[in-house]
Swiss-Prot record:
Subunit record text: Homodimer.
Keyword Electron transport included in the entry's annotation: no
Pathway it works in: Amino-acid biosynthesis; L-leucine biosynthesis; L-leucine from 3-methyl-2-oxobutanoate: step 1/4
Protein name in the entry: 2-isopropylmalate synthase
Matching CDD domains: DRE_TIM_LeuA
Catalysis performed (reactions): 3-methyl-2-oxobutanoate + acetyl-CoA + H2O = (2S)-2-isopropylmalate + CoA + H(+)
Originating organism: Helicobacter hepaticus (strain ATCC 51449 / 3B1)
Molecular function in Gene Ontology: 2-isopropylmalate synthase activity; acetyl-CoA C-acetyltransferase activity; magnesium ion binding
Segments forming domain Pyruvate carboxyltransferase: 30-303
Subcellular location, principal: cytoplasm
Length: 558
């Protein structure tokens, strides 16, 4: 790669101050404008049909957008027809403004206003390119000639609006602002402001697009701050930002630009747009949400938004897309899973009102995600905490600490051999099939206890019928034993009559559900010849569950 042919294509403001950098965070939501139906649509391999655009428009309304760019009606019959459909079928709410794009050319501007006939509220966005490269290479015009194009466009826009019924607001963009000398961009914008004569009731939007991203975000913020300080009639002007993502910094451009004085953001859902895309409004809004600032947009059901978006655009939301992707809250790492599980348990235990869970910047439920399926995910990298969390939430079992470790290794080994993630259902199936109520080699068919003494005590005799498979044959036997407690008497009987050498080294139990009809689950760990393993028993009766747990452990070790 030859880096020497490149040079920095941006321009620093004449007097950068960096006052914006003293601000800690964005304290209030900007005005949001979705450009999905124009900027986003023109970047699709297969542009949306009329019906798909209407579906998307309704989605944007549901999210809460009050300004929606709907197209370039003078340049495309499809976009003209879409705008007319919105107007004629009364699909635009009274509190929503549609935005249309036009070049600073008289015949295009007049056609644009024809398309707006009957529209209650509209923003007409006029632009012309002002960058050094475009002036020199594309238009081959001087600075004064480029400024004249902007001024003529503004005059034509103002006159056309006066001759057309409707409530129109105006927007001007020095396109390719990111490659324009900042003092020259200011000169052009101020000339346009003089023509439009904005008022407090009808403010002018000055849009400063990062048409192609060229600089670090703090440079763009300094450019925005300079414009904000030096624009004429600033109190009646809204500064809008339109960042693209060529250097991967569109979010940072927008956030620092807002700190620097911007009032408005143009962007798209999931950052769809030309080349590397526009700024992702969902990420911007949810970043504010995570700081306790109301973004004034509703992204409480991201999965549903993803479904509509993918259906109408034929695009896919990247699995790691901030806040939106299917894997953004997923924890496969064992240490992460353990920290998340403990953090969520701590929140529940202490009834905390503010969110602060390790590895989760926001509560996944805020965007319609589910802890059990979207947060704790199990593969060969997972740990005991995450696997135990899955079993607890999906199956109601609380694995004892020693069993968590054994079961996690067992599950991870299966995932590793299969080279895949395991679903909660698959984990529960492993637990049920390989640990619970096992009777493949040894089966206790029935049992009967009696106290050794006539008076009640903890010493019991037991008589039990077993089915024991050994050397390809099964034998049914009646055996007896005694011990200090029911489980001990069963263990002694099995040791003596089956020549099994083992010790019970850990035991715990709990109810699967609350109430008298709940099942009991027992965990029994045994050790035999230096090998340790757990078995699990589940039954309506706690004694039976404990016996099944012991037998399950024996079946796993013999």
């Amino acid at each position: 790669m030859s880096y020497t042919k490149y040079q920095r294509g941006y321009f620093m403001p004449p007097t950068p101050s960096l006052e914006w950098s003293k601000k800690e965070y964005i304290a209030k939501a900007p005005i949001w404008c979705s450009v999905d139906l124009r900027d986003g649509n023109q970047a699709l391999i297969t542009p949306m049909s009329l019906e798909e655009k209407i579906t998307f428009f309704k989605l944007l309304l549901k999210v809460g957008f009050k300004e929606i760019e709907v197209g370039f009606p003078a340049a495309s019959e499809t976009e003209y027809r879409f705008l007319r459909t919105l107007i004629e079928e009364d699909l635009i709410p009274d509190d929503v403004s549609v935005q249309v794009l036009t070049q600073a050319r008289e015949h295009i501007i007049k056609k644009t206003f024809e398309s707006l006939e009957g529209c209650k509220n509209a923003i007409v966005h006029v632009y012309n390119s002002t960058s050094y490269a475009q002036r020199e290479q594309v238009f081959r015009k001087s600075k004064d000639e480029i400024k004249h194009i902007a001024c003529e466009g503004a005059i034509c826009l103002k006159e056309s609006a006066a001759a057309t019924k409707g409530n129109f607001r105006f927007e001007y963009s020095p396109e390719s602002f990111s490659g324009t000398e900042v003092d020259y961009a200011l000169e052009v914008c101020n000339a346009v402001i003089d023509i439009f004569e904005p008022t407090l009731e009808k403010k002018l939007i000055i849009n400063l697009p990062v048409t192609v991203e060229m600089s670090l975000p703090h440079i763009y913020a300094s450019q925005v701050e300079y414009m904000s300080k030096h624009l004429k009639n600033r109190e009646n002007v809204l500064i809008s930002l339109h960042p693209h993502n060529d250097r991967g910094c569109a979010i940072a451009d927008a956030e620092l630009g807002l700190l620097a004085g911007a009032d408005r953001i143009e962007g798209t859902l999931f950052g769809n747009g030309e080349r590397t895309g526009n700024v992702d409004i969902i990420t911007l809004a949810m970043n504010m949400h995570s700081h306790g600032v109301d973004p004034k947009l509703d992204f409480s059901n991201i999965p549903s938004i993803c479904d509509v978006y993918e259906k109408v655009t034929k695009m896919q939301v990247y699995e790691r897309q901030p806040y939106s992707g299917k894997l953004v809250f997923a924890a496969f790492s064992g240490s992460h899973q353990d920290a998340i599980a403990k953090g969520m348990a701590y929140h529940k235990e202490h009834n905390l009102s503010t969110w602060s869970v390790p590895y989760l910047p926001i509560d996944p439920k805020d965007v319609g995600r589910v802890y059990e399926s979207d947060v704790i995910r199990i593969n060969s990298q997972s740990g005991k905490g995450g696997i135990a969390y899955i079993l607890h939430h999906h199956y109601g079992v609380n694995l004892p600490p020693l069993f968590r470790e054994e079961f996690s290794y067992y599950v991870k080994n299966i995932s590793d051999k299969a080279h895949k993630e395991l679903s909660p259902d698959e984990i529960c199936e492993i637990f049920q099939n390989d640990f619970v109520n096992l009777n493949n080699t040894l089966c206790v068919q029935d049992f009967h206890f009696t106290h050794i003494d006539s008076k009640p005590s903890q010493e019991f005799n037991v008589k039990l019928h077993i089915l024991y498979a050994k050397e390809n044959s099964k034998t049914q036997q009646e055996i007896t034993g005694k011990g200090n407690g029911r489980l001990d008497s069963i263990a002694n009987a099995l040791r003596e009559h089956l020549n099994l050498d083992f010790e019970i080294i850990d035991y715990s139990e709990h109810s699967l559900k609350k109430g008298s009809t709940s099942q009991a689950v027992s965990y029994v760990q045994i050790e035999s010849k230096g090998k340790k393993c757990f078995g699990v028993g589940i039954d309506n009766d706690i004694i039976t569950a404990s016996i099944y747990g012991l037998v399950s452990a024996l079946n796993r070790i013999i």
